[in-house]
Structure formats: C-alpha cells, structure tokens
Amino acid sequence: MTNEIAGRAGKTERVLYLDCLRILSIAAMMLLHISAQNWSSLDLHDPAWMLFDILNGATRWCVPVFLMISGALFLNSLRPISTKKLLLHNVLRVVTAFLFWACVYGFWNFRNGEPAKEAFLSIFSGHYHMWFLFLIVGLYFVSPLLRCVVGDAQVLKYYLLCFAALDFAIPWLMDCLLLVRIPHTVDALTAIRLAYDRLLGYLPSENVFYFVLGSYLASKEIPKKNRVMLYIAGVIGYIGTVLLTRRQSLLNAFLDLTFLRNGSVNVFLMSAAVFVFGKYGMSRRNPGEGLRRAVVYVSQRCFGMYLVHALIIEALNEKFGLNTLTFQPLIATLLILTITFIGSFIISAILNRIPILKKYIV
C-alpha cells in the first residue's frame, strides 16, 4: 500500500513514521500469530501459558495501527483519490492478491491432507489471517463518505466521542463487571451484554473508528503533556490486557479472548499510544538517506510479508517440526519470529521484482 501524500508543491512525499509503524506492525502481527500457535492447548497454570499471554498481549495493537495508518493516508485531504483510482488500483489490487494467495493456501492445505472439497471452498474465505483484506476493501469503499466526516471538525469530534463510548467504553465496562461476578447480577448483566452485542451489529464497528482515528491523530498536534499521559495509559492498557485475559481465562477455565479484542479499551489505549509515539518519536529524528531508503524499501514489502508469513509459520511446524513448544518457549518463539520475518521479506522482495506480481499480488 502506498505511503505518500501530496506536498504543498503538488509533489508526493513519504511519511517516514508511517513506514516505521507499518514495519513494526507487521512484526507484531507475526508475533501475535506465532505466540497463539499452541497457547489455547496449554494448561492455564503452565508457565508457558503466561509467557504467551505476555507476548500476545504486547502485539494486540498491530491491526488497529494498520487501520490508523490506512486512515491517515486515505482520509488525508492533501492526498486526493479519484473513484477510478480507488477501484482500479487500490480495491483491484487487494482483490487480485486475495484470489492468488487464497489459491496458494488452498493448495497448501490440500497437500497437507485436507480433503479437496474443503481445500477448494477455503479459497472463497481465504486463510485465517486474510480476513483483514475483506475489512480493508470495505473501508476503501466507504472512505469517500468518511472523508466528509473527517472534513468537518465538529462532526469528526462528535463521531470519535460517540463511538468511543458505544464501541469501546460501554461494552468494556460491562465485560469488567461480568469479570468481578457481583452476586445476583451475573445473569442480568449477561443478558444485557448479549442485547448490547445485537445493537453493536447495527453500528459502525471499532475498525471504522480506528480508520477515522488515524486521520485525526495524524493531522492533530498533540501537546507533550497529553502525549506523556497517553503513553502511561498505553502501558496501563498493556498490563490490563495481560492481567484481564489471565483473570477471565481462569474464571472460565479456558483461554478467553474477551479483553484481546480490538474493541477493548485496554487495546485501544495501547494502539493510540503506539501510533502517537510513532508520530512524535520517529518523525522528529533525522535519519541518514541510507536508513531512510532502507525503511521505505522494507515498508513497501510489508503487504507481501503479511500475505506470506502464515505459510512460513505453518511450514516451519509441519515440515521441520519447529513450533513454540519445540524447546524453551521464549527462545523458540523468537527464533520462529526471526525466520518468519526474514523469510517473508525475502519472498516479498523477490515477488516485487516481477512487475505484474508487484502490481497485482504483493
């Protein structure tokens, strides 16, 4: 995905901190999938379970930050996008990439023993990590409408405040109350929570919120005092993610993902903190031209890295027996992450050298 905006003179300029965030986010996404590999199969009291809780919780900002990066670019008034370009470039590229890689993963599943019918049908839904492509196409389609929201400061603030409450605060508070298990209230709260979930089904999701939030945070100057408070809140959000997941899972006697959702307040705090830190911590440094080119080069390969990384993780496990429990879990996880990141980068870089694949597949 491109990472350029129009400058005042009409020239396109890279936004380097968005490139840095994209690279960090793809690494975090890989770690998320690797740490989840055997997590649910472990006993809740196994030390490895807690390790994966710590590692997985540390990565949960990756999808929200990806969405904020896209929002910062697609909703930027200095980066006009025609409907023709939106459909024939952005949407078409995602669709063709999905079809190609869905076939690759379908064939991979078939070669690994999945019945031909199931392997064929999996092409229509894609591999487990490819749900994001459905989401991003939907956001591309509604981005012209969301530009109207972003273009009016009052409407934008109302939207962010309204859906911060509806999509994040209210359901999160109900989840916390259910976690406390106040006597004689559990059944009633559960019924209310289920009813609220039905309401959420008719509202724009937290993913649209992150898309719009990215534009807001990218364009707004945030005072240093507020940034420090947000960073502290982000750390608290991370600690809360780990502890709340642990508590909820022990309560239900299985791995419970309630507080790992993108719509959890704790994940929101982490995500906003990471994005703002990227904006101010990375953009105000003056890297040399060599480092700048390297960052841009890796960033431009991240889409291909996202598409292929799951294949590498599975190949390491199924063909070489390397997974997070092969030996000491932390070392195994970091080794798999290193191999996956480097391998994904090499494959994406090679595919990007073939013009037609670069245009439509990666």
Named regions from a protein language model:
Residues 1-362:
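Alpha-helical transmembrane segments and their immediate juxtamembrane cytosolic regions
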